[in-house]
Design a protein with these regions (language model features):
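Non-cysteine beta-strand/loop elements that form the S-adenosyl-L-methionine
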Residues: 61-64, 125, 282-300, 362-368
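Acidic, low-complexity intrinsically disordered segments
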Residues: 1-231
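Radical SAM [4Fe-4S] cluster-binding motif and immediate context
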Residues: 170-332, 352
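Hydrophobic residues within beta-strands of alpha/beta enzymes
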Residues: 60, 97, 120, 236-238, ...
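Catalytic cores of alpha/beta
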Residues: 108-115, 281, 341-355
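Conserved, mostly hydrophobic/aromatic
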Residues: 148, 238, 354, 373
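Radical SAM enzyme core and accessory elements
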Residues: 1-7, 49-54, 58, 374-476
């Protein structure tokens, strides 16, 4: 038996999309699969004890979606909880433990070593997990499992990442309690592709999902949405890095949803790059059921867009917002303030531009999470010794370790960058302001983890992207 455990206990709860894909893919190879969902358990320790008293798996797989919450100043790190979970499982079962997931794939070696797991899978888990199960049954062949981290003669070995170019994923989505997830989480995720060919300064998606976009067949995506609709789930959100990269695939997905008239039955939200985005794609998305877009704007300063390696220009962002207005799609722009080279002037330029648009809301995050292997590390190394960099923000002591939540805020924004940004926003309620760094500061940002207002709104019946729900709360 293969036991798959959802470890994500963030609230509102998000259904474990990747775990569902892995479970169905494993079943297709003849493996008996059982799922323990700690995401919905009120007492996870009791759930673990009860489960392993009744089951004796051959392999235990843990999905690890988030290494941390990626927000400063909260900087919540979830790896210690994962380590505690592995320790508890060791007491209850002798089965080997394998860890996978998007968050895991960014820090695969570090996590395997830190939590003392037997195996890890970097990249796509659908084929690799089943391959590992059968390799264990044979007692050999670990070197052939794509993405596998494994030990041989006491040495941790790492196979090439599991990023198959032919991306085909299961569509049934029937291994977790979607009704409860929908009632408590307000939406359900789905994927149209994985990977990203862009090299934005800060982004870890190419590290976790692959350096090129790998697309699913549009018919497969539509089949999955129909399966979720049959379970009563009619509000969805893409899990893609950017839905419109590549544009022709986004159009093909929309065309298939329109052909099946799914746009009349489902509401969905998406993350998009600012370009490519035109009237044809906007129209197609709206007809296919899209009701909200979150653009990765980052900045509205030419200097900062160049710093972040964004290909769009300021006027492209304004045009994207206007197109959403014209077709009736609600629109959010996420900003990333405080990167290398940010000044009072560039931040003011960005905020003034967004205030002059007809955007529904703006996320004004003020700090950049630093991931190893990204351009952010290279940029900071060019500034001198990282240990002495005055822009670093962290809650831990000792040597700088990007495995732990470590952020950068340009020193040019002063000693209280959140206050500076709030002054620039000047009370415009469309902006989710950054939270100040003081311990007793009121939370004003759009960190969704453990957001009591959001949890209460969903419990009361709100459905949709979390920024859209919070926006509606502000407008009441």
């Amino acid at each position: 038996m293969l036991t798959l455990i959802n470890t994500n206990r963030m609230a509102p709860p998000i259904s474990p999309v990747g775990l569902e894909y892995v479970a169905e893919a494993a079943r297709r190879t003849g493996i008996d699969v059982s799922v323990l969902d700690l995401g919905l358990s009120p007492a996870p320790d009791d759930a673990l004890r009860d489960y392993f008293a009744r089951h004796t798996p051959s392999l235990i797989g843990l999905s690890f979606r988030n290494v941390d919450d990626c927000f400063w100043p909260s900087a919540q790190w979830f790896v210690p909880e994962l380590r505690e979970l592995v320790t508890r499982i060791r007491v209850l079962s002798d089965a080997p433990v394998v860890i996978g997931g998007v968050g895991f794939s960014i820090f695969a070696e570090r996590i395997v070593q830190h939590v003392d797991a037997d195996f890890g899978i970097r990249g796509d888990g659908e084929g690799a997990t089943a391959a590992l199960y059968w390799a264990l049954a044979r007692g050999r062949g670990f070197e052939k499992v794509q993405g596998l981290l494994w030990r041989s003669d006491g040495v941790l070995r790492s196979n090439p990442p599991a990023w198959p170019s032919d991306l085909s994923l299961p569509t049934r989505r029937d291994v977790v309690d979607h009704a409860t997830y929908f009632a408590r989480g307000g939406q359900c995720g789905f994927e149209t592709k994985r990977g990203c060919g862009r090299r934005c300064l800060y982004c870890a998606d190419p590290l976790s999902k692959g350096p090129v976009a790998r697309v699913r067949r549009p018919a497969e995506v539509a089949d999955e949405i129909e399966s979720l609709l049959a379970q009563g789930i009619d509000v969805l959100h893409t899990c893609d890095a950017e839905f419109n990269l590549p544009r022709d695939h986004a159009m093909a997905v929309c065309d298939e949803l329109i052909r099946r008239r799914l746009g009349e039955r489902v509401r969905w939200y998406a993350y998009l790059a600012v370009t490519p985005f035109d009237r044809e794609l906007a129209d197609a998305m709206r007809r296919a059921g899209c009701v909200g877009i979150n653009f990765t704007g980052d900045a509205a300063s030419g200097l900062m867009l160049n710093t972040y390696r964004q290909p769009h220009r300021v006027q492209d962002l304004g045009r994207a917002v206007q197109l959403c207005r014209e077709v009736g799609i609600r629109v959010m722009v996420d900003l990333l303030l405080g990167g290398p080279g940010e000044t009072h002037e560039t931040a003011a330029e960005t905020i003034a531009f967004l205030k002059g648009t007809d955007v529904d809301c703006v996320g004004a995050a003020c700090a950049v999470r630093i991931y190893p292997g990204t351009g952010m590390v290279e940029a900071l190394e060019r500034q001198g010794a990282i240990e002495q960099n005055p822009g670093l923000r962290r809650k831990y002591t000792g040597p700088v370790d990007f495995f732990r939540p470590t952020f950068y805020v340009s020193p040019a924004l002063g000693s209280d960058p959140a206050a500076l940004v709030k002054d620039l926003i000047a009370g415009d309620e469309r902006f989710f302001e950054p939270t100040a760094e003081q311990p007793d500061a009121e939370t004003t940002d759009h960190n969704y983890n453990d957001n009591a207002d959001l949890v209460d709104a969903i419990r009361a019946g709100a459905r949709g992207a979390y920024w859209d729900i919070l926006l509606d709360l502000r407008r009441r």
